[in-house]
């Protein structure tokens, strides 16, 4: 591998991949826009009677606005990445840190913090426009400027704390534990992530939202009956004040082991019936009972293990980092640059992970169908689609590449086939 790393012109490859990624994804988004335009004059047959003409037109305008903004943000992100790397901004930050400390561990923390702050500042206009222009324009935004700023600072502090611990741990291991450091680093990061995942529902999520026990007996009784039927034990049923920020609805469960919690958006409880809620929850429980979470964890471990091995090899090559605009070649600057550019080398895996995710969504629907009423599954999905102004006519290539969930029409058709 070292011969390949030393002889390859990564500058050309890097720029080419950024260009290919942007052009491919822009092409798919334009296809999606055309699909929306082609179907704008008539409500899709399956949604007749579910959405009104006015609601359908609003969803069309909303999705067109979002896709156009996504094209802009993709271009913006590509330009920023090039400025960070080949433009020398990352190297400039690395040189500031090198002049400040000779400690690799402290350097990793300082450079990671600088990178995080710069990225946060750059992303602010994007977040503001998305929240206070697009979401506001279409009636979904409930976020106040105070909540927005508070969320931003909370997120920054939490990200800074977690990333500093991870970066310091990894760099300490790299410097002190010899050639097989990547095995120990992989294990350490896995343990840290497991701890974070365990603590997330009880320490981090409450910093952003209020969680109150579900006390609505009309919803609570059928849900508890379903939990008993599928033998699922949780820490409790909670309602999250999602309406503080948005009118979008959702339900999910978080944590693992004794910290498993089922969470419902308060916005969801206002729009669906208890029977529909039971069917939606049946889907979420399906992911757990069918081992999807365990399988995702195992695949993450495998890819993480491979990723750390590749990192261990790449760190030995100055050429890789010089070709990405880094001249201040410390172990921590190399590590963080690798983290920064890795996405450009792995984006092609997205359609495969999306396809696997959609397969598991169908399986979770099948699980829910076994334990709940299929008719209520359909009506619940249709309501969620309507309330979230989902794209009812997505382009097939676009959805194949991007969608982690099958289009609503496909999920409904699958359930209807089982009802026959």
Language model segments and positions:
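Polar-ligand-bearing catalytic/cofactor-coordination segments
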Residues: 4-329, 343-420
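Acidic/His/Gly-enriched intrinsically disordered linker/tail segments
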Residues: 331-336
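Alpha-helical transmembrane segments
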Residues: 337-341
């Amino acid at each position: 591998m070292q011969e390949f790393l030393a002889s390859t012109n990564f500058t050309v490859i890097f720029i080419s991949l950024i260009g290919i990624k942007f052009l491919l994804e822009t092409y798919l988004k334009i296809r999606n826009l055309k699909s929306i335009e082609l179907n704008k004059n008539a409500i899709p047959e399956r949604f007749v009677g579910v959405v009104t003409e006015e609601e359908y037109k609003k969803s069309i305008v909303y999705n067109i606005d979002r896709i156009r903004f996504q094209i802009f943000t993709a271009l913006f992100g590509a330009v920023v990445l090039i400025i960070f790397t080949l433009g020398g901004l990352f190297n400039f930050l690395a040189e500031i840190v090198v002049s400040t400390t000779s400690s690799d561990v402290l350097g990793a923390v300082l450079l990671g913090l600088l990178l995080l702050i710069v990225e946060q500042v750059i992303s602010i206009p994007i977040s503001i426009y998305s929240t206070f222009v697009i979401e506001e324009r279409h009636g979904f935004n409930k976020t106040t400027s105070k909540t927005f700023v508070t969320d931003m600072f909370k997120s920054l502090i939490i990200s800074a704390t977690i990333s500093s611990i991870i970066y310091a741990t990894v760099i300490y291991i790299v410097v002190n534990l010899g050639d097989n450091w990547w095995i120990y680093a992989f294990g350490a990061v896995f343990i840290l992530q497991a701890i974070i995942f365990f603590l997330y529902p009880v320490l981090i999520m409450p910093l952003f939202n209020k969680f109150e026990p579900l006390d609505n007996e009309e919803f609570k009784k059928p849900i508890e009956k379903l939990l008993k039927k599928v033998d699922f034990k949780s820490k409790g049923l909670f309602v999250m004040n999602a309406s503080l920020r948005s009118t979008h609805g959702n339900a999910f469960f978080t944590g693992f082991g004794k910290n498993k919690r089922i969470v419902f958006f308060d916005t969801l409880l206002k729009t669906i019936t208890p029977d529909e809620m039971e069917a939606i929850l049946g889907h979420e429980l399906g992911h757990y009972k069918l081992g999807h979470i365990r399988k995702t964890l195992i695949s993450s471990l495998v890819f993480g293990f491979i990723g750390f091995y590749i990192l261990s090899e790449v760190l030995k090559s100055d050429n890789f980092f010089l070709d990405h605009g880094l001249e201040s070649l410390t172990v921590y600057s190399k590590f963080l640059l690798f983290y920064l550019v890795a996405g450009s080398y792995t984006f092609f895996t997205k359609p495969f992970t999306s396809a696997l995710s959609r397969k598991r969504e169908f399986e979770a629907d099948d699980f829910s169908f076994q334990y709940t009423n299929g008719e209520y599954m359909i009506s619940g999905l249709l309501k969620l689609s309507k309330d979230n102004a989902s794209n009812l006519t997505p382009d097939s290539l676009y959805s194949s590449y991007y969608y982690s969930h099958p289009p609503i029409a496909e999920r409904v058709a699958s359930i209807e086939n089982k009802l026959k």
